[in-house]
């Protein structure tokens, strides 16, 4: 397995920046920033299906082992921009003596995910030696996540607290992405200033803080490391508020509405909620992760957001007594792609002409043959409904947004990662 690697030395300093993975692929990014005594890795992600050559668990272990065997420093750590698998997916392979850092919201989402996986494994697997190994592995992952060092998001117009890894200073800055609690980093070492954007956008509800943050804090930047996910895609990046407006229009035209969306995207769930309220529809959800995520969002963000991120959807499960009321009054049901069988059962007896699926996810999941081969769930969900409308916007920066970020920051050097091979700024 070959892997494109890029390295640059910052002038008049001991700072070395190594892109172990991500210079020619979306996801699976691993960036190393080192000095004579210290090094910090930004993200240790799992490769995304369909975006590069798949790796086996053995190859992942060898990759992590080889990276940590080289350039060993007295002070080492991994910091995560957010909790998507293509950024945190190799966390369980990081050596135990290397501390890992993430925002508290990201930690809570990871704990929710792996706790639910453990519950599913307990219920689905018959007692056996193999089941015991799986549950032990689940427990080890949960313990490792609990051991993460965490930071809290600061209030608006307040400088975030920095932390030190040896002689490297890291300051996390909250941003908008398609998952809750996503961050950029200002990384300072040996007189040099590096701005790592992680994944970001300016068209979400939380995206309004992007440019003011850059104007205020991203000055005298020697190196800007930015994502470039959309550079070859040409994604149409409408505002999240426009997503909600379009949803409200079609929700008003159908009695029964299913919304296929990510459980961890706080801004998309807010769009669904706002649209359903405008359309005067009852709000429901199914799926354990959806419920846990909304409780995290409500607990942490309801008051700060003045109610925008206050979620009180009603839960719907198997043989639920709510079915009768829902069929009578109509509904909006938010769900994930793994719950198709339940949703089909719930829609039995309903007139298909009154049922609409709002597909609110990346269209590549059902259009790209490689994506469909890896996971056909999104395509299958879409094909199960005669009435379907796509209403979505990217969780990533548009080409115009990336250009504006570069223009504001005015870095001495730019490295673009998290992009397809051949994509150019």
Model-derived features: positions:
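Short acidic, S/G/P-rich loop/turn micro-motifs used as interaction or catalytic elements
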Residues: 231-232, 338-343, 363-367, 422
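Histidine/acidic-residue-rich catalytic or RNA/ligand-binding cores of hydrolases
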Residues: 297, 370-376, 399-403
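His/Asp/Glu-rich metal-coordinating catalytic cores
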Residues: 2-77, 86-267, 271-278, 282-286, ...
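Mobile, glycine- and charge-enriched loop segments
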Residues: 352-358, 366-395
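Short, charged/polar "capping" segments at the starts of alpha-helices
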Residues: 50, 108-111, 267, 290-295, ...
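Internal alpha/beta domain cores that form substrate/cofactor-binding pockets in large enzymes
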Residues: 365-368, 388-425
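Hard-cation-handling environments
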Residues: 233-354, 358, 382-384, 401, ...
């Amino acid at each position: 397995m070959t892997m494109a690697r890029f390295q640059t030395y910052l002038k008049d300093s001991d700072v070395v920046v190594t892109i172990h993975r991500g210079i020619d692929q979306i996801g699976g990014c691993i960036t190393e920033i080192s000095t004579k005594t210290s090094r910090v890795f930004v993200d240790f992600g799992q490769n995304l299906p369909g975006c590069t050559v798949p790796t086996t668990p053995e190859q992942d272990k060898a990759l992590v082992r080889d990276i940590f065997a080289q350039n060993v420093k007295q002070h080492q750590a991994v910091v995560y921009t957010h909790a998507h698998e293509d950024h945190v997916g190799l966390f369980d392979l990081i050596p135990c003596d290397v501390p890992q850092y993430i925002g508290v919201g990201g930690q809570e989402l990871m704990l929710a995910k792996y706790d639910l996986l453990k519950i599913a494994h307990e219920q689905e697997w018959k007692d056996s030696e193999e089941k015991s190994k799986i549950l032990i592995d689940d427990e080890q992952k949960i313990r490792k996540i609990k051991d993460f060092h965490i930071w809290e998001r600061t209030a608006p117009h307040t400088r975030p607290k920095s932390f030190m890894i040896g002689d490297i200073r890291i300051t996390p800055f909250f941003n908008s992405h398609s998952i809750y609690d996503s961050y950029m980093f200002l990384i300072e070492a040996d007189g040099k200033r590096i701005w790592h954007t992680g994944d970001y956008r300016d068209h979400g509800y939380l995206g309004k803080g992007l440019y003011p943050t850059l104007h205020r804090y991203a000055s005298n930047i020697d190196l800007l490391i930015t994502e470039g996910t959309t550079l070859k895609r040409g994604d149409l990046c409408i505002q999240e508020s426009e997503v909600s407006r379009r949803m409200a229009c079609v929700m008003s035209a159908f009695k029964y509405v299913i919304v296929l969306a990510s459980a961890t995207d706080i801004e998309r769930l807010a769009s669904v909620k706002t649209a359903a309220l405008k359309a005067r529809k009852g709000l429901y959800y199914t799926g354990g992760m959806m419920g846990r995520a909304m409780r995290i969002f409500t607990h942490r963000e309801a008051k700060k957001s003045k109610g925008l991120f206050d979620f009180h959807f009603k839960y719907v499960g198997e043989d639920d007594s709510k079915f009768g009321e829902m069929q009578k009054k109509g509904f909006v049901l938010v769900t994930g792609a793994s719950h198709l069988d339940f949703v089909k059962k719930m829609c039995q007896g309903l007139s298909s002409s009154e049922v609409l699926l709002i597909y609110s996810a990346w269209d590549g999941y059902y259009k790209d043959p490689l994506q469909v081969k890896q996971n056909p769930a999104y395509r299958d969900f879409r094909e199960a409904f005669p009435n379907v409308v796509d209403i979505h916007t990217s969780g990533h920066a548009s080409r115009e947004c990336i250009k504006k970020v570069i223009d504001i920051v005015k870095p001495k050097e730019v490295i673009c990662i998290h992009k397809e091979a051949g994509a150019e700024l």
